[in-house]
Every structure is written in C-alpha cells, then in structure tokens.
Amino acid sequence: MIFFRAVGRCVRMVGMFVAAGTELAVKQPETRQERADWLHRFCARAMRGMGIEINVSGSFPKRGVVISNHLSYLDIVVYAAIHPCVFVSKAEVAGWPVVGWMTTMSGTVYVARGHGGSAMKAREGMQAAVDAGLPVVFFPEGTTSNGSGLLKFHSGLLAQPLDGGAPVTAACIRYGFAEDNGPDVSVADDVCYWGERNMLGHIFTFLGLRGVRAEVRFAEEPIEFSSDTLHRKEAAVEARAAVATLRLGNTIVGEERVPR
C-alpha cells in the first residue's frame, strides 16, 4: 500500500511541477516579492498534494530574519507554504532533486562553503530581501539532523542582521504522525533526512507515508542579542538557546492550521 501511495503522489507532484513551471513561463515573476509569492503558492499546493497538515503556533514575522532548526528538505517547503519568504541555503541545495529547482526559481540566496566571497554575497542578498520587505529564513546548523537535539549554530550569516539591525525571530520545526505507519517507520529515519542517505529513495519512501504532520512554533518576540558583529559566536550561542527553548514546548494541539 505504501508503494502505491508513493507512486500516486509522485504522479500528482509531477503534475504540480508542470503547472508551476507553466506559471513561471507565463507570468515570468521578476521581483523578489513575486518570486516569493510563487514559491508560497507552489509549496501550499505541494503540502495538500502530499497530504501533510501544518500546525502553527505564533506568527510568521512579516519582516526581518527567521532562524530555525533543520531536519529535512521538507523544512523549506513547510516554511514557504506558511508565508512568502526568501531562503538562505548551502550551495549544495541547488543540486537537490525537486527542492533545488524550486528554491533556485524562487530566488534563494546560496552560500558556498570555503569560498571567501560567497558569505559577503549572501549577506548582500539577505539585505536586499529584507529591504524588499520579505522575511529571510535560514538554518544556522548548516545541515540536517534526526531531531534528537540541536547541532552547533554557525555564526557567519548572523552578521547581516546584527549589522543591519533586522529583527531575528527564533522558530522551531518538528514532525509527527497522525496515523500509524507501522513498526518499522519512524520520524527520525523516514521524515527527517540526514547523514549519507540516498535522497531520491528517501523522498519516495516519504511520499508513501500517511498522516504526516508538521508543527512550527515561532517565538513571540525577536531575540535580544547581547552580542554585536564582532562577537558573532556569542550571538550564535544566544540564537541556539532561543530555538532550544521553543523545542522544549509541548506538542502543538489545536493551534492555527495552515489552510489546505
């Protein structure tokens, strides 16, 4: 049954990509806002197509920077489905199946590790998005995990909001099942994507799951940093603590649901 469900959803997703590509070709969005709006519409449809429910606690900030833990390629789709935004991602994401095309077309700011000028270009891209009135989302862990804890937060991308004065809001994402998928299925292995796993195989398995639920919690207020640009490592510690606090909250029940 899982296999046939996955095949059916794959076919449905192909149709969605064709429709999204056609929309891009016809409307040719030029501004950051138009591209963010396109991604928002596409991701909202994708969530419905995959049968994923999103529960949200708090409000997606209308401007500034959002920092979050990172569990899967799905994180980008979930955040974009909630509200139009711009992402900052590692350059490798551009080569990911499905997600890479989606993020590139929407104007994601990519960071190439080990390239000195890449971080500066990323900061400029972040500032341009903030100036355009769009929230910027990035994942300071720099990679995904199985959700058992928080990895170290990297400090490089915090320079832009610390320098530019943009508010930084902490967020936390996690996943669960509203339906039983059997004893051999777990969120850590079959929803979270981490380690050296084959992405296409993981996506196919994921598409066969039932009752996947994404839960996103936003902090009520932006982080009040005690550190400045010259002490970004301390700021990264403070940012990590803010996200860790959100992770300690109870499972979201009866909160706002993103319309399906």
Predicted regions and their residues:
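Cytosolic-facing loops and C-terminal tails of multi-pass membrane proteins
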Residues: 233, 238-260
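A transmembrane-helix-recognition feature enriched in membrane-embedded lipid enzymes
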Residues: 1-55, 101-106
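A cross-family acyltransferase "interaction/gating" segment
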Residues: 99-100, 148-230, 250-256
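Catalytic core of membrane glycerolipid acyltransferases/transacylases, capturing the structured
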Residues: 18-25, 29, 48-49, 62-116
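Residue-level preference for the first positions of well-ordered beta-strands
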Residues: 63-65, 108, 133-139, 167, ...
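Soluble extracytoplasmic domains of inner/organellar membrane proteins
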Residues: 119, 126-130, 134-136, 140-158
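Generic beta-sheet signal
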Residues: 90, 111, 139, 171-173
